[in-house]
Amino acid sequence: VPVSIPPALDAQRGNGPDWAGWLDRLPRLAADVVEEWGLTPDGESMHGACSLVLPVRTTGRAPAVLKLTYDGDDESEHEGLALQRWGGRGVVRLLRADPHRRALLLERLHTEDLSDLWDVEACEVVGGLYSRLHVPALPQLRTLTSYVARWTDDLQRMPRNAPIPRRLVEQATALARSFVVDDASTGTMIHGDLHYANVLSADREPWLVIDPKPMSGDPTTSRRRCCGTGGTSWPATSAAACADASTRWSTPPASTRTAPATGSWCGW
């Protein structure tokens, strides 16, 4: 069965030749994995910002999804390792993986996500997942501090005539540098992109997490990602209540500093 590439994913060709090359290879790659793993297509192709997601049935007729991720996305390189480490505890279950081809076979979840809930209720759900996700980091993972160091270098190169007060740039740079050298900034495996759209309803548990951008970091940064991604602007009271909800459920924080947001959205 020919694999169709959703137009919105195919539009990523505009990001350069690496993207275009991967998209050219993608239909054949998908067809090869489907055949080799004995899968049967079972619905319309879906996509995230950097992945193709195909609903399939396994050889045992179990519903699943085949996820094929852009091979130039370093943030998702160790997604399979992280899912294997979590072992389905609070997260989508990994059924099979081919890291070389960035192919993951995952249990199929529902399409409803936390965006359908009241903000505080959604943050309570996410907060309840923190203690299950925040485990000792795998040695293969990139560190959050490596990303922050790179972002800080970019910030320092900002021209002095940029439309932002220089003192704010200098303050942000100083805070980032202190974050990078703090030992508490690494050592815990964090999801890296834990927001409403990355928590889907399921049968095995009420809610399960998808699409990690795993890294070794500080678990307190997860709260910033959750409370900073709500889809629409929140009233101050709602934002504060949500932050309180996620904090009460999270693992004991290593610090109370303000940390940078991490990652970017990518469904599934």
Residue ranges and their predicted role:
Residues 1-91, 202-206:
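Conserved NTP-binding catalytic cores of kinases and kinase-like/nucleotidyltransferase enzymes
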Residues 46, 50-58, 65-66, 94, ...:
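Active-site acidic catalytic loop and adjacent metal/ATP-binding pocket
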Residues 27, 60-105, 110-133:
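A conserved alpha-helical element in kinase catalytic cores
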Residues 1-4, 8, 112-170, 187, ...:
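A cross-family kinase active-site recognition segment
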Residues 201-247, 251-254:
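Active-site Asp-x-Gly
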Residues 22-32, 138-192, 202-203, 251:
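An alpha-helical support segment within catalytic cores of ATP-dependent transferases
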